[in-house]
């Protein structure tokens, strides 16, 4: 909710969103609408919504949207701290780059990938044309470490969904296969994966 520029939802509005999705699901036959949120990773690695609210979401994506000038150790530990939260499933746009506009922040991607492997946290290949983050080299290293990846378009309009093609291209350039990608799972398989990760981190 602290990220106003991206129309971040207040806790009250997120609760309303969850309730709305539940109402929709009650009216659907044979289809389930999942409810998730991209949640700001604060400077200390904690999340911008309370745990009791995050537990009600099917999918939680952690992302850094501020504090880009933190030192290498601090920003790396910030991401890894978020990974150790059992309620976080995916880390979005892990390097924060905006092509031609902003350099990646000074993060130790080898350490992040290793932590993702240990914690079972997935990493995003953000397919937005100005991000392409992870890039193909980092995506390949993640896949080699057994890390699951998720392609997201960062779309704010239907017309931007075509950028999924760019994300698929990054994954292919990284020699990734369907077995590496959360996108290839059925809804049931995805929910089983999220539950398994949560149980693993709470053990």
Named regions from a protein language model:
Residues 1-32, 41-203:
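Charged catalytic cores and adjacent phosphate/nucleic-acid-binding surfaces used
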Residues 38:
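Two-metal-ion RNase H-like nuclease active-site motif
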């Amino acid at each position: 909710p602290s990220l106003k520029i991206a129309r971040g939802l207040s806790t009250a509005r997120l609760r309303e969103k969850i309730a709305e999705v539940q109402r929709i699901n009650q009216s659907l036959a044979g289809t389930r609408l999942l409810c998730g949120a991209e949640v700001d990773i604060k400077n200390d690695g904690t999340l911008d919504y309370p745990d009791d609210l995050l537990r009600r979401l099917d999918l939680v994506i952690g992302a850094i949207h501020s504090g880009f000038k933190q030192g290498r150790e601090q920003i790396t530990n910030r991401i890894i701290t978020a990974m150790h939260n059992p309620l976080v499933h995916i880390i979005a746009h892990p390097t924060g780059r905006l092509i031609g506009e902003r350099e990646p922040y000074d993060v130790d991607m080898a350490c992040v990938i290793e932590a993702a492997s240990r914690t079972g946290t997935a990493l995003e290949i953000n397919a937005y044309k100005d991000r392409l983050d992870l890039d193909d080299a980092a995506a390949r290293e993640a896949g080699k470490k057994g890390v699951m990846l998720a392609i997201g378009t960062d779309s704010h309009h239907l017309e931007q969904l075509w950028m999924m093609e760019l994300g698929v291209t990054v994954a292919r350039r990284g020699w990734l296969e369907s077995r590496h990608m959360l996108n290839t799972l059925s809804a049931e398989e995805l929910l089983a994966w999220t539950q398994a990760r949560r149980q693993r981190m709470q053990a």
